[in-house]
Amino acid sequence: MTQLTNIVSNDTLVNLQEEYDKTQIQEVLNELNQELIGLVPVKTRIREIAALLLIDRLRRKLELVSGNPGLHMSFTGSPGTGKTTVAMKMADILHRLGYIKKGHLLTVTRDDLVGQYIGHTAPKTKEVLKQAMGGVLFIDEAYYLYKADNERDYGSEAIEILLQVMENQRNDLVVIFAGYKDRMEKFYESNPGLSSRVANHVDFPDYTSEELLQIAKMMIEEQQYCFTEEADKTLLEYTERRMKQPYFANARSIRNAIDRARMRQANRIFASGEKVLTKADLVTIEAEDILKSRLFSLPNN
């Protein structure tokens, strides 16, 4: 009770706004809003984590004792929903707040961690961890690390090493596991020791067709192209059709569609026989450049 009274009666002041401005994390949060369309639940969750870490930083300045906040994370969602981009921003936030020393992001998959024969996995995993120290290790499609149907698989060895480092060197490294939500849930069920070390779970929703159209416009502007009004409508229809097809990968699929539209635009211009071109000719994507996709020849179920 005495200790609590001392804390409550202590009139030491800390300036939250000053600390917030000093870390410049608002700059990263602004980038997140500008660079990623939609994803409101994700952005909200990242702001919540940033707020927790900022307050924890202030508490430590006043020597208020509390356990270190759990920083390891799980990003779940379909491909192309911005998981890697958000991981990069999270690494930047953690660095600015002083929770990691370097702030870099190292992205790996099973192949980078797991060997093909006895004695090969440990050196591979340890080398990756060495490279990731002081930053964030992003393990994409993490569920491939564990193969329950194969007792001789070496993935479990990599997981054991990860567990040790996540616990013993949590002040030097943050690990983010990523993948499809349903598979990640099974992965954690099979590895309870891993699940207990992951404090922050962030679910990435699929984009709507309207959001994907906004993303397409952002991508096309970055490459100094533009859509005609009719091309806008055609791309929206393309997106709605593509979302119903197998292997749809959100923004990644839209980027591929734009690349193909650019190729068709180039071929259209080349085939026209025009020898003198205007700037408008070179930057404009027409509806026909999208309509020639084989997707429009398929039944729209």
Curated annotation (Swiss-Prot):
Q: Which InterPro entries match?
A: AAA+_ATPase (IPR003593), AAA_lid_6 (IPR041627), ATPase_AAA_core (IPR003959), CbxX/CfqX_mono (IPR000470), CbxX/CfxQ (IPR000641), CbxX/CfxQ_RuBisCO_ESX (IPR050773), P-loop_NTPase (IPR027417)
Specify which residues bind ATP according to the UniProt entry for this protein: 77-84
SUPFAM superfamilies, sorted = P-loop containing nucleoside triphosphate hydrolases (SSF52540)
Q: Which UniProt keywords apply?
A: ATP-binding, Chloroplast, Nucleotide-binding, Plastid
Q: SMART domains per the record? A: AAA
Q: In which domain of life is the source organism classified? A: Eukaryota
Q: Where in the cell is it found?
A: Plastid, Chloroplast
GO terms of molecular function: ATP binding; ATP hydrolysis activity
A cellular component term from Gene Ontology for this protein is: chloroplast
Its function, per the record, reads:
Necessary for the expression of RuBisCO.
Q: Which NCBIfam families match?
A: cbbX_cfxQ
Q: What is this protein called?
A: Protein CfxQ homolog
What organism does the record attribute this protein to?
Porphyra purpurea
